[in-house]
Amino acid sequence: MSIIKAEEVTFEYVRRDENGNIEGKNRAIDKVSMDVKEGDFISILGANGSGKSTFAKHLNSILLPTEGTVWIDGMDSKDDEKLFTIRQTAGMVFQNPDNQIIGQVVEEDVAFGPENMGIPTEQIRERVDEALKTLGMMEFAKKSPNRLSGGQKQRVSIAGVLAMHPKCIVLDEPTAMLDPAGRKEVIRALRALNEVEKITIILITHYMEETIYSDKIFVMNKGKIMMEGSPREIFTHVEELEEYKLEVPKITLLAHELKKKGVDIPECILSDKELADALKKLV
């Protein structure tokens, strides 16, 4: 069953002059279609200006299509009467956790969403504890978010969304402001949410190595979907990805160069271990 379905979605920003008159329009998304099944881990890859973040904001009705339709669990994103339910169904996590965390204490911040939903107090306590345990943040429940690392803050942001019991979490470049350790921390948490909790994950990123465990990758450029497929299918197209200003993981690039020089290894290598195993077979 589809949890997210986009049909020929186009979005245009209106440009106005200093008097407020319309000067023209910029097309940020151009006829994008996408079908995300419940329980999938999907990654949307693209360089800055590709339209990926603009598209992400359509997935819980922050933005509405100029043309086309976005369905969230069968609900039209343009249906004002369903807006509350849509945002419960598809939670959103943004790039900077400091802009999303509002509580003075971690557990208070995680409780904010369920409180606004009108959840009974005893259930809020259960949801907060459950979300913090799932994200490995229970020991920080009484701490100030200001004392946490970037990766820990982002996990608190994700816990706040998780406490609202969404079917899907959309994450718009959640690791962009983190160091490598923080990035790994967040991606590990997302994989666990998907594999253990069966929550649909839609990850928006320009870091290709974060997408290796996805069920499917969509590559965007200039507002359009240029490629889609499994990580192995996508990573095979090294030159094309570089044209879209995406940085192919070093191990995949190394394997690609070896292959070009005639080394008999598989077409697409995704990890150090895969490359080591392939080279061992040649000895």
Question: Language-model features: where?
Answer:
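Helix-to-loop junction immediately C-terminal to a conserved catalytic motif
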Residues: 60
